Amino acid sequence: TMSGFDALPADARQDRLEPSGAGWEKALANVKASVAGAELPFPQGYVAALFGYRRAARETFAVERSIWIAAPRERVWRAITDPAQIEMWFSPGTSWQLSALEVGGRLFVRNPETGAEMYTQVIELIDPPHRFVTRSAPPETAHVTTYRLQEERGGTRLTITHAGYELEPAEMRWNNMEQNAFGFGMMLENVWAYVEGRTLPYPGGF
């Protein structure tokens, strides 16, 4: 039995209920296979430390994930805003560059063949160590990513909200949201491991 859905925003409740039910069915199938000594039908498993949902409000579609990290907000803030540290947990071996840690600053990697910017994120808001907001630059769809850092139980709750899916074709939207929800979960696990000095669960990055 899993409860607590009444605490979610009303517009997110149903979207959380449906995938949670399917997730528990898969988890039970894994338990059954493990007890029987058989191969797990869903080897990727599920991470209880992560919390997230997708929501639609005022025609704005977003994915949201969060994780608790045993470190102060200042430490987590550096991990998500310092290009050298981003490289360590996001894309080991691929150097990130930041023009300036200020509104309008650009965070990006260089195309190894042409030298052009790739995966550019433009800083929209910076409020250390509480909130960090970026927007993807053209030619990418203008998604806005918000990082919120909250003190919790002597550590930090890091929450990522990725919005802008309403700009995508309707037939692609939910599939992209599902894939990105999984991807942001992986990303948060890597941040958690990096900050706490653990082995990265996804050492190849993203």
Task: Give residue ranges: language-model regions.
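Glycine-rich portal/gate segments that line the openings of hydrophobic small-molecule binding cavities
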Residues: 96-137
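A short, structured loop/turn motif at beta-sheet edges
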Residues: 73-74, 124-129, 148-157
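Generic structural detector for well-ordered beta-strands
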Residues: 66-70, 108-110, 122, 148
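Short, surface-exposed coil-to-beta transition loops
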Residues: 62-64, 116-120, 141-146
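Hydrophobic pocket/interface hotspot
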Residues: 24-27, 31, 76-80, 86, ...
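Hydrophobic ligand-binding cavity/cleft-lining segments
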Residues: 50-96
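Beta-strand/loop substructures that line and gate deep hydrophobic ligand-binding cavities in soluble
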Residues: 1-26, 137-186
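Short, highly charged C-terminal tails/helix-capping segments
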Residues: 33-57, 193-206
